Amino acid sequence: MGADVVGGIPHYEPAREFGEKSIYDTLELALKYDKLIDVHCDETDDPNSRFVELLNAVVLMEGYGEKTTASHTCSFGSADNSYAFRMMDLFKKSKMNFIACPTENAYLQGRQDTYPKRRGLTRVKEFMEAGINIAFAQDSINDPWYPMGNGNMMNILDNGIHLAQIMSPEEIEKDLDLITYNGARCMHIQDKYGLDASKDANFIVLDGDSSFDVIRNRAPVLASVRKGEYLFKRKPVEYEVALDLGIKY
């Protein structure tokens, strides 16, 4: 099998039973070929769309949670608390990963709502507090689902921390993980990823002095390095402002 990941989109199936079968089929293929799983799961406002429950159950039983990601899970943001917190206990047991796409989820969800109008995101803040791996991503680059997508992860992070309300001093120190280390865990490359000695020199350089600065300013990328070689680099932006101090020499 030439693919790296087996995917599915059960909530698009014409009936619940077909969606459930697609989850079993996805897991069967992934186990057969030892591939990762990434399911576009419950990308809907409908709180009765609960395919994430079945996906979590089957990967929990197979011990495959760390190699599985449930993307979007927008309906989980509409679920009642008693169900949500019961499920989060099970998510912790399976160690399944989650991905939210802040711009797409906010743009596409809540279309049938009047007011109050849902934000469209899954329970990002609660996942972080519970120690469940959650990452931010963008799955639409200038396409019909989200025409404004350009792959700028600092923009994704900025939107995500507003929509998920994660801007306390303690949260800001962890927010960059949402577009770095947490994503690496979703891709199951956490052992290769990072700045530790002996790991490949793959990183970007942002124009800022701290996590707070680069997040607040949506800092531009000054350099991108891949295996120790520059893919590109540029100088920081400089400004010149003419000042008239009214002094004659």
Stretches with model-predicted labels:
Residues 1-97, 113-136:
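Histidine/acidic residue-rich metal-binding segments in metalloenzymes
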Residues 13, 75-76, 103-106, 139-142, ...:
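Short, glycine-/Ser/Thr-/acidic-enriched flexible segments
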Residues 14-15, 45-47, 106-108, 143-145, ...:
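Short secondary-structure capping/turn micro-motifs that flank functional sites
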Residues 16, 78, 108, 170, ...:
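Glycine/Thr-rich phosphate-binding loops of Rossmann-like dinucleotide-binding domains
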Residues 19-20, 50-52, 111-113, 146-151, ...:
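Short secondary-structure transition/capping segments
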Residues 36, 57-68, 104-108, 118-206:
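His/Asp/Glu-enriched, well-ordered alpha-helical/loop segment
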Residues 99-101:
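Oxyanion-binding "anion nests"
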Residues 173-249:
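Active-site microenvironment of metallo-dependent hydrolases
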